[in-house]
Amino acid sequence: MKVKVLCRNPDDYVRETKRDLQRVPRNYDPALHPFEVPREYTRALNATKLERVFAKPFIASLDGHRDGVNCIAKHPKSLSTVLSGACDGEVKIWNLTKRECSRTIQAHDGFVRGLCVRFCGTSFFTVGDDKTVKQWSMESPGYGEKVEPIRTILGKTVFTGIDHHMNDAIFATCGQQVDIWDEQRSAPMRSYAWGVDSISSIKFNPIETHILSSCGTDRSIVLYDKRKPTPLKKIILEMRTNTLCWNPMEAFIFTAANENFNLYTYDMRYMDGPVKVHMDHVSAVLDVDYSPTGKEFVSASFDKSIRIFPVQSGHSREVYHTKRMQHVTCVRWSADNKYVLCGSDEMNIRIWKANASEKLGLLSPRERAAQNYNQKLKEKFHHHPQIKRIARHRHLPRSIYSQIKEQQIMREARRKKDVNRRKHSKPGSVPIPSEKKKHVLAVVE
């Protein structure tokens, strides 16, 4: 007698533990699910609404400075350590885990103009208005010992910025000229000067480490190679660039923060015009810093706000502000890509989430799966008008809101004026300048 027996694999329907979810057989044939897209749209809409409900980006404020915060530096080896320099010459080392100051140093007379940490994290360098470069140990002195710098270099002019090489015992300073220093020498290895104006900021390329760039008060951005005796290239803009930052993942890309309220992303190989123009600020942009992924950057502005921009987007995806926060002078993105730190005029350092609605701490597997699913749904439907409107909605201070309206009116007036000038001129005599290239005056090699 022949008997046919049903044979099932228990792995397909039996849970491994009693805490697992029950396995439900599903048929994913689209013909059986005609309302799949409307259901997904509703879920995407609800996920977008909940994202705005839970958007609480502010985490903490670090107070302790007695004057405005002028510069911030990250520790290359420790996520929880941050250094800040103030306008009264005071440098503080902060423990972000405990949210308290672990050490205070009276480093300079006058402003602390620049601050950078050595690549190994054992010491840091400061420059100030007293024409000195000082190297300090990261370790606290023993009981009863005085806080003294490891090394002091006295310069001939005021230093306005400093940055350290990513791998070697070399650092660069700027002021009346750009100087490349060896840590063991009291005189610069190499000096660069192009024109008579002073240099306000200098940055090493983190990938092509022999390349560095500077911003001058003559509205210029200059590229240098520390192996060559002369600068490489100079680009002159309509207005002054306050600072710049190199992309940590793309060796040739950097973003410059300009006085004309915009940020410009350049490719150092093609300096005739920027790759992208980022606009949303309503006052001068004072600082910029990239995320470790190189896909986004954060900017600080004189309009009392900070904004987060995707690299490929011309407009910001996020804006942060508080009632008490004044002009934001410096900003940094943490090395774990989770937080943003900013220092402002009213003597506070604020810690923000990089993603405003992100839940901090450990996530259960189900939470992580739901989060990833909602994120994919939002990306799928982000062009739909209702979802786009909710995702873009932000509350702004009245001052910023009114300035945005005013700038829109001014921009429209300039556009109409150009159209009328072109209409009443000989065809082809009035060119149409692109937004990317109209701010570049000259490129000098």
From Swiss-Prot:
Belongs to the WD repeat DCAF13/WDSOF1 family. WD repeats lie at residues 64-104, 107-146, 154-191, 194-234, 236-276, 280-319, 323-362. Part of the small subunit (SSU) processome, first precursor of the small eukaryotic ribosomal subunit. During the assembly of the SSU processome in the nucleolus, many ribosome biogenesis factors, an RNA chaperone and ribosomal proteins associate with the nascent pre-rRNA and work in concert to generate RNA folding, modifications, rearrangements and cleavage as well as targeted degradation of pre-ribosomal RNA by the RNA exosome. Substrate-recognition component of a DCX (DDB1-CUL4-X-box) E3 ubiquitin-protein ligase complex. SMART domains: WD40. GO terms for molecular function: ubiquitin-like ligase-substrate adaptor activity. Disulfide bonds: none annotated. Residues 413-445 are annotated as: Disordered. Part of the small subunit (SSU) processome, composed of more than 70 proteins and the RNA chaperone small nucleolar RNA (snoRNA) U3. Component of the DCX(DCAF13) E3 ubiquitin ligase complex, at least composed of CUL4 (CUL4A or CUL4B), DDB1, DCAF13 and RBX1. It comes from Xenopus tropicalis (Western clawed frog). This is DDB1- and CUL4-associated factor 13. Residues 353-441 are annotated as: Required for nucleolar location. Gene3D superfamilies: YVTN repeat-like/Quinoprotein amine dehydrogenase. GO terms for cellular component: Cul4-RING E3 ubiquitin ligase complex; nucleolus; ribonucleoprotein complex. The lineage of its organism: Eukaryota, Metazoa, Chordata, Craniata, Vertebrata. Keywords: Nucleus, Repeat, Ribonucleoprotein, Ribosome biogenesis, rRNA processing, Ubl conjugation pathway, WD repeat. GO terms for biological process: oocyte growth; protein ubiquitination; rRNA processing. Residues 413-426, 436-445 have a biased composition (Basic residues). It is found in: Nucleus, Nucleolus. Pfam families: Sof1 (PF04158), WD40 (PF00400).
